[in-house]
A protein has these predicted regions:
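Conserved "landmark" site that anchors the functional core of diverse proteins
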Residues: 1-360
Length: 360
Protein backbone atom coordinates (compact mmCIF):
# COMPACT_ATOMS: atom_id res chain seq x y z
CA UNK A 1 0.00 0.00 0.00
CA UNK A 2 2.96 2.31 0.47
CA UNK A 3 6.61 2.51 1.42
CA UNK A 4 7.19 0.86 4.82
CA UNK A 5 7.71 3.28 7.68
CA UNK A 6 8.88 2.70 11.23
CA UNK A 7 6.78 4.28 13.96
CA UNK A 8 7.51 4.75 17.64
CA UNK A 9 4.79 5.02 20.26
CA UNK A 10 6.10 6.60 23.45
CA UNK A 11 4.06 5.46 26.44
CA UNK A 12 3.41 8.62 28.46
CA UNK A 13 0.89 7.22 30.95
CA UNK A 14 0.91 3.41 31.01
CA UNK A 15 -1.78 2.63 33.59
CA UNK A 16 -2.14 -1.16 33.35
CA UNK A 17 -1.31 -1.72 29.69
CA UNK A 18 0.59 -4.44 27.86
CA UNK A 19 1.12 -6.05 24.48
CA UNK A 20 -1.53 -8.68 23.90
CA UNK A 21 -3.01 -10.91 21.19
CA UNK A 22 -5.56 -13.72 20.94
CA UNK A 23 -3.37 -16.21 22.81
CA UNK A 24 -1.75 -19.61 22.27
CA UNK A 25 -4.57 -21.52 20.64
CA UNK A 26 -2.66 -24.82 20.72
CA UNK A 27 -1.15 -24.25 24.15
CA UNK A 28 -3.48 -26.55 26.08
CA UNK A 29 -2.23 -29.59 24.17
CA UNK A 30 1.19 -29.21 25.79
CA UNK A 31 0.01 -28.02 29.19
CA UNK A 32 0.58 -24.34 28.39
CA UNK A 33 -1.77 -21.60 29.56
CA UNK A 34 -3.74 -20.30 26.56
CA UNK A 35 -3.76 -16.67 27.67
CA UNK A 36 -4.66 -13.87 25.30
CA UNK A 37 -7.22 -11.08 25.38
CA UNK A 38 -10.08 -11.87 27.74
CA UNK A 39 -12.45 -10.03 25.41
CA UNK A 40 -11.52 -11.86 22.22
CA UNK A 41 -14.26 -10.17 20.18
CA UNK A 42 -13.18 -6.60 20.98
CA UNK A 43 -9.50 -7.43 20.39
CA UNK A 44 -10.21 -9.07 17.05
CA UNK A 45 -12.42 -6.14 16.01
CA UNK A 46 -9.74 -3.57 16.91
CA UNK A 47 -7.34 -5.29 14.53
CA UNK A 48 -9.98 -5.87 11.86
CA UNK A 49 -10.90 -2.18 11.79
CA UNK A 50 -7.32 -1.24 10.86
CA UNK A 51 -6.84 -4.03 8.30
CA UNK A 52 -4.49 -6.02 10.51
CA UNK A 53 -4.88 -9.79 11.06
CA UNK A 54 -7.28 -10.45 13.92
CA UNK A 55 -4.58 -12.38 15.80
CA UNK A 56 -1.96 -9.61 15.46
CA UNK A 57 -0.39 -8.00 18.56
CA UNK A 58 -2.16 -4.94 19.95
CA UNK A 59 -2.26 -2.97 23.20
CA UNK A 60 -4.62 -3.98 26.01
CA UNK A 61 -5.56 -1.53 28.76
CA UNK A 62 -7.16 -2.59 32.03
CA UNK A 63 -9.21 -0.11 34.06
CA UNK A 64 -6.65 2.72 34.30
CA UNK A 65 -6.01 5.82 32.16
CA UNK A 66 -3.53 5.57 29.28
CA UNK A 67 -1.70 8.08 27.07
CA UNK A 68 0.89 7.75 24.31
CA UNK A 69 2.51 9.93 21.65
CA UNK A 70 3.36 8.83 18.10
CA UNK A 71 6.15 10.13 15.88
CA UNK A 72 4.42 8.92 12.69
CA UNK A 73 0.93 9.24 11.22
CA UNK A 74 -0.99 6.09 12.20
CA UNK A 75 -4.37 4.51 11.62
CA UNK A 76 -5.74 3.06 14.87
CA UNK A 77 -8.96 1.73 16.38
CA UNK A 78 -10.08 1.68 20.01
CA UNK A 79 -12.61 -0.97 21.08
CA UNK A 80 -13.73 -2.69 24.26
CA UNK A 81 -15.06 -0.89 27.33
CA UNK A 82 -16.57 2.57 27.06
CA UNK A 83 -13.93 5.27 27.58
CA UNK A 84 -13.10 8.86 26.72
CA UNK A 85 -10.77 8.81 23.70
CA UNK A 86 -9.02 12.02 22.64
CA UNK A 87 -6.17 13.10 20.36
CA UNK A 88 -4.61 16.33 21.62
CA UNK A 89 -7.86 16.96 23.48
CA UNK A 90 -10.16 16.37 20.49
CA UNK A 91 -12.81 13.68 21.19
CA UNK A 92 -12.62 10.56 19.01
CA UNK A 93 -15.01 7.68 18.39
CA UNK A 94 -14.53 4.11 19.52
CA UNK A 95 -15.23 1.15 17.25
CA UNK A 96 -14.15 3.09 14.15
CA UNK A 97 -10.74 3.73 12.54
CA UNK A 98 -9.06 6.90 13.81
CA UNK A 99 -6.28 8.94 12.22
CA UNK A 100 -3.54 9.59 14.80
CA UNK A 101 -1.25 12.34 13.46
CA UNK A 102 2.49 12.39 14.10
CA UNK A 103 3.48 14.38 17.19
CA UNK A 104 0.04 14.19 18.82
CA UNK A 105 -0.96 12.48 22.05
CA UNK A 106 -3.65 9.82 22.25
CA UNK A 107 -5.38 9.64 25.65
CA UNK A 108 -7.80 6.93 26.75
CA UNK A 109 -9.37 7.86 30.08
CA UNK A 110 -12.38 7.19 32.30
CA UNK A 111 -12.71 3.53 31.34
CA UNK A 112 -16.20 2.59 32.45
CA UNK A 113 -19.09 0.19 31.74
CA UNK A 114 -16.52 -2.50 31.10
CA UNK A 115 -12.96 -3.21 32.18
CA UNK A 116 -10.69 -3.68 29.16
CA UNK A 117 -9.92 -1.45 26.18
CA UNK A 118 -8.07 -2.58 23.05
CA UNK A 119 -5.90 -0.37 20.84
CA UNK A 120 -5.31 -1.78 17.38
CA UNK A 121 -2.67 -0.24 15.10
CA UNK A 122 -2.42 -0.69 11.34
CA UNK A 123 0.96 -2.26 10.68
CA UNK A 124 3.15 -4.78 12.45
CA UNK A 125 3.60 -4.20 16.18
CA UNK A 126 6.98 -5.52 17.31
CA UNK A 127 6.55 -7.90 20.23
CA UNK A 128 8.48 -10.81 21.77
CA UNK A 129 6.76 -14.15 21.21
CA UNK A 130 6.52 -17.36 23.21
CA UNK A 131 5.13 -20.39 21.38
CA UNK A 132 3.79 -18.16 18.63
CA UNK A 133 2.07 -15.57 20.83
CA UNK A 134 2.98 -12.34 22.63
CA UNK A 135 0.26 -12.92 25.27
CA UNK A 136 1.66 -12.50 28.80
CA UNK A 137 2.12 -15.65 30.89
CA UNK A 138 2.26 -14.79 34.58
CA UNK A 139 3.35 -18.31 35.55
CA UNK A 140 6.43 -18.23 33.33
CA UNK A 141 7.06 -14.53 33.89
CA UNK A 142 6.71 -13.76 30.18
CA UNK A 143 5.43 -10.34 29.15
CA UNK A 144 5.01 -7.29 31.36
CA UNK A 145 2.98 -4.11 31.65
CA UNK A 146 4.35 -1.00 29.97
CA UNK A 147 6.38 1.51 31.98
CA UNK A 148 6.25 5.29 31.55
CA UNK A 149 8.64 6.37 28.80
CA UNK A 150 8.81 2.93 27.22
CA UNK A 151 8.64 2.81 23.41
CA UNK A 152 6.48 0.48 21.34
CA UNK A 153 7.71 0.00 17.75
CA UNK A 154 5.40 -0.46 14.76
CA UNK A 155 6.22 -1.15 11.10
CA UNK A 156 3.64 0.66 8.94
CA UNK A 157 2.89 0.30 5.23
CA UNK A 158 -0.20 2.53 5.10
CA UNK A 159 0.23 5.78 3.12
CA UNK A 160 0.01 9.03 5.02
CA UNK A 161 -3.64 10.14 5.14
CA UNK A 162 -4.94 13.64 5.70
CA UNK A 163 -8.19 14.08 7.64
CA UNK A 164 -9.01 17.76 8.25
CA UNK A 165 -12.39 17.17 9.90
CA UNK A 166 -11.79 15.85 13.41
CA UNK A 167 -15.51 15.93 14.15
CA UNK A 168 -16.11 13.09 11.69
CA UNK A 169 -14.66 9.58 11.56
CA UNK A 170 -12.68 8.86 8.42
CA UNK A 171 -14.56 5.58 8.01
CA UNK A 172 -17.88 4.50 9.42
CA UNK A 173 -17.93 0.73 9.20
CA UNK A 174 -20.75 -0.39 11.47
CA UNK A 175 -18.78 -2.46 13.98
CA UNK A 176 -21.13 -3.61 16.75
CA UNK A 177 -19.89 -3.14 20.33
CA UNK A 178 -20.90 -5.17 23.35
CA UNK A 179 -23.92 -3.98 25.30
CA UNK A 180 -22.29 -2.54 28.43
CA UNK A 181 -24.77 -2.10 31.25
CA UNK A 182 -23.18 -3.56 34.39
CA UNK A 183 -25.50 -6.57 34.14
CA UNK A 184 -24.33 -9.38 31.90
CA UNK A 185 -26.38 -12.05 30.15
CA UNK A 186 -24.04 -15.05 29.98
CA UNK A 187 -24.98 -18.10 27.88
CA UNK A 188 -23.82 -21.46 29.22
CA UNK A 189 -23.98 -25.07 28.08
CA UNK A 190 -24.24 -28.13 30.33
CA UNK A 191 -20.99 -29.22 31.94
CA UNK A 192 -19.79 -32.83 32.20
CA UNK A 193 -20.77 -33.08 35.88
CA UNK A 194 -24.21 -31.45 35.75
CA UNK A 195 -26.04 -34.65 36.70
CA UNK A 196 -24.21 -34.72 40.04
CA UNK A 197 -25.92 -31.48 41.14
CA UNK A 198 -29.51 -32.70 40.88
CA UNK A 199 -32.19 -30.05 41.41
CA UNK A 200 -29.67 -27.57 42.86
CA UNK A 201 -28.75 -26.68 39.26
CA UNK A 202 -31.67 -24.24 39.40
CA UNK A 203 -29.67 -22.16 41.90
CA UNK A 204 -27.35 -21.27 39.01
CA UNK A 205 -29.96 -20.56 36.34
CA UNK A 206 -32.58 -18.73 38.34
CA UNK A 207 -30.58 -16.14 40.29
CA UNK A 208 -28.28 -13.16 39.77
CA UNK A 209 -24.62 -13.50 40.74
CA UNK A 210 -22.15 -10.72 41.54
CA UNK A 211 -18.52 -10.63 40.36
CA UNK A 212 -16.16 -10.77 43.34
CA UNK A 213 -13.14 -8.49 43.95
CA UNK A 214 -10.59 -11.31 43.63
CA UNK A 215 -11.53 -12.03 40.00
CA UNK A 216 -8.73 -11.80 37.42
CA UNK A 217 -7.51 -13.23 34.11
CA UNK A 218 -7.30 -16.71 35.63
CA UNK A 219 -10.93 -16.81 36.65
CA UNK A 220 -13.92 -15.00 38.09
CA UNK A 221 -15.37 -15.67 41.53
CA UNK A 222 -19.08 -15.03 41.86
CA UNK A 223 -21.57 -15.29 44.70
CA UNK A 224 -25.33 -14.87 44.66
CA UNK A 225 -26.52 -11.29 45.02
CA UNK A 226 -29.09 -12.41 47.62
CA UNK A 227 -26.38 -14.41 49.47
CA UNK A 228 -28.45 -17.54 48.96
CA UNK A 229 -27.04 -21.05 48.53
CA UNK A 230 -25.14 -22.03 45.38
CA UNK A 231 -25.44 -25.41 43.61
CA UNK A 232 -23.76 -28.34 45.35
CA UNK A 233 -22.95 -31.93 44.44
CA UNK A 234 -25.38 -34.62 45.53
CA UNK A 235 -22.69 -37.33 45.37
CA UNK A 236 -19.64 -37.90 47.57
CA UNK A 237 -17.31 -39.59 45.09
CA UNK A 238 -13.84 -38.13 44.74
CA UNK A 239 -13.20 -35.84 41.76
CA UNK A 240 -9.84 -36.50 40.14
CA UNK A 241 -7.88 -33.72 38.49
CA UNK A 242 -8.51 -33.66 34.74
CA UNK A 243 -8.32 -31.31 31.80
CA UNK A 244 -10.83 -28.47 31.96
CA UNK A 245 -11.89 -26.06 29.21
CA UNK A 246 -11.75 -22.29 29.27
CA UNK A 247 -15.14 -21.19 30.55
CA UNK A 248 -15.61 -24.10 32.96
CA UNK A 249 -18.04 -23.20 35.77
CA UNK A 250 -16.58 -24.97 38.80
CA UNK A 251 -18.22 -25.38 42.18
CA UNK A 252 -15.66 -25.55 45.01
CA UNK A 253 -16.61 -25.78 48.66
CA UNK A 254 -17.97 -22.51 50.01
CA UNK A 255 -20.45 -19.91 48.82
CA UNK A 256 -18.87 -18.90 45.49
CA UNK A 257 -18.66 -20.43 42.05
CA UNK A 258 -15.53 -20.12 39.92
CA UNK A 259 -15.44 -19.48 36.17
CA UNK A 260 -12.10 -20.34 34.60
CA UNK A 261 -10.93 -17.83 32.00
CA UNK A 262 -7.99 -17.70 29.59
CA UNK A 263 -5.31 -17.58 32.28
CA UNK A 264 -6.43 -20.86 33.84
CA UNK A 265 -4.24 -23.91 34.25
CA UNK A 266 -5.17 -26.82 32.03
CA UNK A 267 -6.15 -29.18 34.87
CA UNK A 268 -8.40 -28.82 37.90
CA UNK A 269 -10.20 -31.03 40.38
CA UNK A 270 -13.52 -29.30 41.09
CA UNK A 271 -16.78 -30.54 39.54
CA UNK A 272 -17.75 -28.68 36.36
CA UNK A 273 -21.42 -27.74 36.41
CA UNK A 274 -21.52 -25.75 33.16
CA UNK A 275 -19.32 -24.19 30.48
CA UNK A 276 -19.60 -20.56 29.37
CA UNK A 277 -19.86 -20.21 25.58
CA UNK A 278 -17.17 -18.47 23.52
CA UNK A 279 -19.43 -15.45 23.03
CA UNK A 280 -20.16 -15.34 26.77
CA UNK A 281 -16.45 -15.47 27.65
CA UNK A 282 -15.76 -12.22 25.78
CA UNK A 283 -18.54 -10.57 27.76
CA UNK A 284 -17.11 -11.88 31.03
CA UNK A 285 -13.77 -10.40 30.00
CA UNK A 286 -15.43 -7.00 30.50
CA UNK A 287 -17.20 -7.78 33.79
CA UNK A 288 -16.05 -5.55 36.65
CA UNK A 289 -16.08 -6.50 40.33
CA UNK A 290 -19.57 -5.61 41.53
CA UNK A 291 -21.22 -6.25 38.14
CA UNK A 292 -24.08 -8.74 38.14
CA UNK A 293 -24.38 -11.83 35.95
CA UNK A 294 -27.41 -13.90 34.95
CA UNK A 295 -26.64 -17.31 33.45
CA UNK A 296 -28.78 -18.47 30.51
CA UNK A 297 -28.73 -22.15 29.51
CA UNK A 298 -28.39 -22.75 25.76
CA UNK A 299 -27.83 -25.78 23.59
CA UNK A 300 -24.51 -26.50 21.94
CA UNK A 301 -26.12 -25.78 18.57
CA UNK A 302 -27.24 -22.34 19.78
CA UNK A 303 -23.77 -21.58 21.16
CA UNK A 304 -22.20 -22.47 17.81
CA UNK A 305 -24.76 -20.38 15.90
CA UNK A 306 -24.08 -17.36 18.15
CA UNK A 307 -20.33 -17.67 17.53
CA UNK A 308 -20.81 -18.01 13.79
CA UNK A 309 -22.92 -14.85 13.71
CA UNK A 310 -20.18 -12.99 15.58
CA UNK A 311 -17.52 -14.33 13.23
CA UNK A 312 -19.65 -13.39 10.22
CA UNK A 313 -19.92 -9.83 11.51
CA UNK A 314 -16.14 -9.63 11.91
CA UNK A 315 -15.79 -10.91 8.35
CA UNK A 316 -18.31 -8.35 7.04
CA UNK A 317 -16.47 -5.49 8.75
CA UNK A 318 -13.19 -6.82 7.36
CA UNK A 319 -14.67 -6.76 3.85
CA UNK A 320 -15.71 -3.12 4.29
CA UNK A 321 -12.24 -2.27 5.58
CA UNK A 322 -10.58 -3.88 2.55
CA UNK A 323 -12.90 -1.90 0.26
CA UNK A 324 -11.97 1.34 2.04
CA UNK A 325 -8.24 0.55 1.92
CA UNK A 326 -8.47 -0.31 -1.78
CA UNK A 327 -9.98 3.13 -2.35
CA UNK A 328 -7.17 4.73 -0.34
CA UNK A 329 -4.56 2.86 -2.38
CA UNK A 330 -6.19 4.12 -5.58
CA UNK A 331 -6.38 7.64 -4.17
CA UNK A 332 -2.64 7.58 -3.43
CA UNK A 333 -1.60 5.88 -6.68
CA UNK A 334 0.60 8.13 -8.86
CA UNK A 335 -0.85 6.52 -12.01
CA UNK A 336 -4.45 7.43 -11.23
CA UNK A 337 -5.95 10.59 -12.61
CA UNK A 338 -6.95 13.06 -9.87
CA UNK A 339 -10.27 13.56 -11.64
CA UNK A 340 -11.17 9.88 -11.33
CA UNK A 341 -9.90 9.39 -7.79
CA UNK A 342 -12.51 8.75 -5.07
CA UNK A 343 -13.59 11.98 -3.43
CA UNK A 344 -13.86 12.41 0.34
CA UNK A 345 -17.25 13.44 1.69
CA UNK A 346 -17.66 17.08 2.61
CA UNK A 347 -18.13 18.02 6.29
CA UNK A 348 -21.85 18.52 5.66
CA UNK A 349 -22.33 14.92 4.51
CA UNK A 350 -22.99 12.63 7.47
CA UNK A 351 -21.74 9.58 5.54
CA UNK A 352 -18.00 8.97 5.34
CA UNK A 353 -15.65 6.84 3.29
CA UNK A 354 -16.39 3.13 3.65
CA UNK A 355 -19.83 3.53 5.22
CA UNK A 356 -22.39 1.05 3.83
CA UNK A 357 -25.62 2.77 2.82
CA UNK A 358 -27.77 0.69 5.14
CA UNK A 359 -25.94 2.07 8.19
CA UNK A 360 -26.64 5.78 7.75
Amino acid sequence: MGEPRSAQLRIDRPGLSCLQDLGRQEGSRIGQMTGGALDQYSAAMANTLVASPSEAPLIELVAHDFAATTDTDLLIAVTGADADVTIDGRPQQQWEPILWPAGSQLAITRIRAGLRVYLGVHGSVRAPHLLGSCAPDTVLGFGAVFAAGEVCHVEVDCPTISQPWFGLPFFRLGARPHHFAGHWDIPITDGPDIAEFGSTVDRLHGHDYVVGPSSNHIGLRLGRTDQGPIPHRQTRTEVLSRGVPIGAVEVPAGDEILILHRGRGVTAGYPVLAVVTTVGLSRLGQARPGDTVRFRPVSTATAIADLRRQQAHLHDVGTRVRTAFTSLASLNSPTRSPLSAPQLQSPTDHRTVGEPHELH
